[in-house]
């Protein structure tokens, strides 16, 4: 008998890094593939929708909540590292910083940039997450997905149509189950040092301890969204309980019990100011659920 709990009417504010979100009609937190498959079969039998919320970063959930089942993947963890071949097999709920540190400890080079990104492997693949001119697609060999009808599929990285913060998965109803990465061998001590330097830099330049979703806006390459926002004097600007970070202007923090509407209105205001001043229409990285 499967031991996974399916809980009802649970506040999603406790499941997002923004600390924002209304109740989930149902929520499940699978720990392994068997539990994940059980949950998907359950949604099919009940004929209710399924929304993947990962570990809750890069996500804005409506204060009214989400209908159907919310699939939280933060307990869906596991990493296997083959040091000799530089191959890493990782379940999609594993956090990027954890993987970055374990890769460094194993003497594998290429993932140092990911140490301060508060997201899961699954979310990183879907969004093609990156930093410091790196992105996960450069190291991704393949993924395993599960459809909402319960079918598994192995997809090569080159077939995912990656672009800047984009992938084929954003338009497909597929759950990322696991990823296979290929990294290069290096000296563990040096890789750990670079990894720690990257983390320290993030701690100094980003509101790491505040409630945020991560970066809000995509960079309108070659420009930086944060620079455009900062030049308009918007650091510290607030709408309700939502505030543009005084540390890094591409972060919106939950400064005082912000509502989902506070965040949406602040995003709308920033986009208007940037467009009026520069003629540039900023796009958001944030996934919105329940609106």
Curated annotation (Swiss-Prot):
Gene3D superfamilies: 3.30.465.10, UDP-N-acetylenolpyruvoylglucosamine reductase, C-terminal domain, Uridine Diphospho-n-acetylenolpyruvylglucosamine Reductase, domain 2. Its cofactor is FAD. It is found in: Cytoplasm. Its EC number is 1.3.1.98. Keywords: Cell cycle, Cell division, Cell shape, Cell wall biogenesis/degradation, Cytoplasm, FAD, Flavoprotein, NADP, Oxidoreductase, Peptidoglycan synthesis. One of its GO terms (molecular function) is UDP-N-acetylmuramate dehydrogenase activity. It comes from the Bacteria. It is an enzyme of class 1 (oxidoreductase). Residues 19-186 form the FAD-binding PCMH-type domain. One of its GO terms (cellular component) is cytosol. Pathway: Cell wall biogenesis; peptidoglycan biosynthesis. Belongs to the MurB family. NCBIfam families: murB, PRK13905.1. Cell wall formation. PANTHER family: UDP-N-ACETYLENOLPYRUVOYLGLUCOSAMINE REDUCTASE. This is UDP-N-acetylenolpyruvoylglucosamine reductase. It comes from Prochlorococcus marinus (strain NATL2A).
């Amino acid at each position: 008998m499967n031991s996974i709990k399916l809980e009802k009417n649970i506040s999603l504010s406790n499941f997002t890094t923004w600390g924002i979100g209304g109740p989930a009609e149902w929520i499940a937190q699978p720990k392994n593939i068997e539990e994940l498959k059980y949950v998907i079969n359950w949604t099919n039998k009940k004929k209710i929708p399924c929304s993947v919320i990962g570990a809750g970063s890069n996500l804005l959930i409506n204060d009214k909540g989400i209908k159907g089942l919310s699939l939280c993947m933060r307990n869906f963890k596991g990493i296997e590292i083959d040091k000799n071949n530089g191959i890493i097999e990782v379940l999609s709920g594993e956090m990027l910083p954890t993987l970055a540190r374990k890769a460094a400890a194993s003497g594998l080079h290429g993932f140092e940039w990911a140490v301060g990104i508060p997201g899961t492997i699954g979310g990183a693949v879907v969004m093609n997450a990156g930093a410091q001119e790196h992105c996960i697609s450069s190291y991704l060999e393949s993924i395993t997905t599960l459809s909402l009808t319960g079918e598994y599929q192995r997809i090569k990285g080159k077939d995912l149509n990656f672009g800047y913060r984009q992938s084929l998965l954003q338009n497909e109803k597929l759950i990322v189950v696991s990823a296979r990465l290929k990294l290069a061998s290096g000296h563990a001590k040096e890789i750990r040092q670079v990894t720690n330097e990257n983390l320290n830099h993030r701690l100094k330049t980003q509101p790491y301890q505040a409630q945020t979703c991560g970066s809000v806006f995509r960079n309108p390459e070659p420009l930086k969204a944060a620079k455009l926002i900062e030049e308009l004097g918007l650091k510290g600007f607030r709408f309700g309980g939502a505030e543009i970070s005084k540390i890094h202007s591409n972060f919106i923090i939950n400064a005082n019990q912000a509502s989902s509407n506070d965040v949406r209105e602040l995003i709308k205001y920033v986009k208007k100011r940037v467009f009026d001043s520069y003629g540039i229409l900023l796009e958001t990285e944030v996934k919105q659920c329940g609106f």
